[in-house]
Amino acid sequence: MARYIGPSCKLARREGADLSLKSPSRALDSKCKLEQRPGQHGAVRKSKLSDYASQLREKQKVKRIYGVLERQFRNYYKNASTKKGNTGENLLQLLETRLDNVIYRMGFAVTRPAARQLVSHRSVLVNGKMVNLPSYHVKPGDVVALSQRAQKYLCVQESLTIKDQHGSAFSWIEVDSEKFSGVFKALPDRADLPSDINEALIVELYSK
């Protein structure tokens, strides 16, 4: 299945949630009515979904937040289920260690799609070596940096400015904005991750 490249507002309306697909400096467009489904005459969202529908929607929401396709997501779940500990938390940790997500968390890109583009365009180094695979898993202790060329990009400069304005910092990541680099210190705890994600619903879905 091809990656979605249409309006981000449409995805947000489909899931009824802000998927962080737009810059934090721009609020969701006034036309992006999250209480309504996509379409010119989108029906008002039902207040109650079946258990299966709730589980499916949660999976779709998380896939769209992290920009992961169905087969990738299923593989992440299988990997998470074989690890020790809570499967749902393991799943979120795997998604958080994706290189495109780490670039986003470090503040070098305003959205995950923008971070994915930086990685794909060979603008990111991991431990001094160029990596152009967005799904590359960053390990604790890895040093992630932008190339000399990417450091001059206006979009990167603007992203760092927005990061400073919004004070977005994460305990498991240490960033040196002046050097355009950061260290992935450790896997994040569940308490450090988005509270609006209910990973238990995803586990219930795949456990059937």
Swiss-Prot record:
Pfam families: Ribosomal_S4 (PF00163), S4 (PF01479). Residues 97-158 form the S4 RNA-binding domain. One of its GO terms (cellular component) is small ribosomal subunit. It comes from the Bacteria. One of its GO terms (biological process) is ribosomal small subunit biogenesis. Keywords: Ribonucleoprotein, Ribosomal protein, RNA-binding, rRNA-binding. GO terms for molecular function: rRNA binding; structural constituent of ribosome. CDD domains: S4 (cd00165). PROSITE patterns: RIBOSOMAL_S4, S4. PANTHER family: 30S 40S RIBOSOMAL PROTEIN, SMALL RIBOSOMAL SUBUNIT PROTEIN US4M. One of the primary rRNA binding proteins, it binds directly to 16S rRNA where it nucleates assembly of the body of the 30S subunit. Part of the 30S ribosomal subunit. Contacts protein S5. The interaction surface between S4 and S5 is involved in control of translational fidelity. Belongs to the universal ribosomal protein uS4 family. This is Small ribosomal subunit protein uS4. It comes from Xylella fastidiosa (strain Temecula1 / ATCC 700964).
